[in-house]
Structure formats: structure tokens, C-alpha cells
Amino acid sequence: MDFTRRRFLLLTAAASAGTPPAQAGIDHLPIDTTFKNVERYHRIMTKAQAAGWGQIPIGPRMALLGRECLGIAYVGYTLEIDDRVECPSANFDGLDCWTFFEIALGMARLLERPKAVYTPGDLLKEIQWTRYRAGLCTGNYLERIHYLNEWFIDNEARGNVKDITRALGGAVRLKGRESREMTMLWKGYRYLRNNPSLRPQMARIEAKVNELPVWYIPKA
């Protein structure tokens, strides 16, 4: 996924404040597996609280939180944390284009609900709420939303975000695109590599994803 400043701004502008249910967090794996660099997370949230970032609109708030992540190494596949058990996770030692956005969104949403100290579990609940279909994770790898177009549709249906692409003008529907990365490049994914039975199921998910509409704005 090519992550650009323009895409980040569009994503942050689209974010809203649907709230995860109190029971959303489920402990499937140890916290030292699911959460890396708790100290950095606490530093960012403490600074955000002291500066009153929870009072500003969520788009600019996400941008400020994203800037606090500058300097963190770009690392791929950080969601592949176990051979079998799927679990919400956050890694402040390494981010890719998507986890950078996801963590900034999670922290921004947390700041709308003031509390003395935000725990790692608080952020994991937020991440679970947006990362998984219907906000639910019971330990099954296939519950995670792996493709961006499905993520938008699922989260928009639950009031978490609003896809503003078509409202910007000049948008066209993408045609002829096939989503097959997960099944074609399965060796790069720890869960698919260690659980061959998941691959046919992932192929069926990809077939459904291919039927979803994708809108984009062509370059001028």
C-alpha cells in the first residue's frame, strides 16, 4: 500500500467517533506479545492530554499524534504476532503505512473520553473495534479485515468513519482490480503459512472483496 500525505489527510478527515463497547477487549495473548513499547505510548498520550488535544477536531488531532510517531522505524508484517491465535496488537517500535494510521486513529478516539491514565488495553480495544469485522475478535485470523475497501465499508456501516471519496468530485469506480495478495503471497503471512486450512477460506473472502465497489480520484 502506497501511503502518501494526501491519503493520510483523507483518512483523518473521514474519521469519526463511534465508541467500542466496553466488552470489546479480549485477552488472547500476553501483553508483551500484543503491545510493544508501552513507554512510548504513555509519553505520547501524556503529552496529548497535557496539551488538550482531545478538544480539537479529530483530523488535526490525528495529524498531531501521527507526528509524535515520526522516527519510528517502518516495519512490515507487525500484525503477524502468533502462529495460530489472532489478537488485537499495537507496535510502537515498528509501523507500516496502515498501522501508522490505525494507531493514530485509536489514540485520537481515546482522547475523546478523558481519563487519568490511558492503558495499553484501552488502545487495544480501540484497535479491535476498527480492525475486525463488526469490531469482534475471538482469536480467528479470518476475523481481521485485510483489505482497505472492506475496512471502509465495515467501519462506515458502524459509524466509525465516513468515506468522502465520491463527495470530493471527480471520483470514478475502479474496474478490473483483483485482490489476491493474501492467497498468492501466503508465505509472507505467518498465520497462513502455519495454517494451510485458512488459505481456501481467505480465497473466498478475497472473492467477496473483489465484488465490493472501489472509488478513487485519478491524478490530473
List PLM regions with ranges:
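Active-site-adjacent substructure of cysteine-protease-like catalytic cores
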Residues: 213-220
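Acidic/His-rich structured neighborhood in mature extracellular/periplasmic domains
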Residues: 74-212
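Sequence/structural signature of beta-propeller domains
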Residues: 33, 49, 53, 57-80, ...
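Charge-rich, solvent-exposed alpha-helical interaction surfaces
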Residues: 44-47, 201
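N-terminal export signals
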Residues: 2, 7-24
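C-terminal segment of N-terminal export signals and the immediately downstream linker at the start
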Residues: 20-44
